[in-house]
Regions:
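Short nucleic-acid-contacting surface segments enriched for D/E, G, S/T with interspersed K/R
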Residues: 28-33, 74-93
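Disulfide-stabilized netrin-like
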Residues: 58-76
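Compact mixed alphabeta submodule
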Residues: 82-111
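OB-fold ssDNA-binding interfaces and closely related basic DNA-contact patches used
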Residues: 1-61, 101, 107-111
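Polar/charged alpha-helical tracts
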Residues: 13, 17, 63, 76, ...
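Surface-exposed beta-strand edges and their flanking turn/coil or helix-capping segments
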Residues: 50, 68-69, 79-83
Length: 111
């Protein structure tokens, strides 16, 4: 595993502990979910797969949940927003749309 980008210096043990304690795949979140990102890590696995982990703090409960995705579109959108805003403390809204061919796409917009 090779860390490509991160919002702060993460100890690998800390990163994996957070990911394993409370882990959700972004594709399993309901439509119109607001993701309140407090930290971010993108890494490449040993087999070359790129994965992004968003550390989400629930506004209602204060619970920290890690949300993982390997979607290149989501990763590119998030990193463009981070570069533009200059911060990793951002909120994104997840929505889904369907193509004419029936494929479901996840949209990831800055709130």
């Amino acid at each position: 595993m090779r860390i490509e980008r991160q919002s702060r210096e993460f100890d690998k043990k800390e990163m994996f502990k957070m990911a394993n304690d409370n882990h959700v795949l972004m594709k399993n979140l309901p439509d119109d979910t607001i993701v309140n990102v407090t930290d971010y890590v993108r890494y490449t696995t040993d087999d070359g797969k790129e994965v992004a982990i968003f550390y989400h703090t629930s506004i209602e409960t204060g619970e920290v949940v890690t949300i993982a995705t390997s979607s290149p579109t989501v990763i590119k959108t998030a990193e463009s927003a981070y570069d533009f805003m200059g911060t990793y403390n951002l909120q994104f809204k997840l929505t889904r749309s369907q193509s004419k061919a029936g494929r479901t796409y996840m949209n990831f917009e800055l709130v």
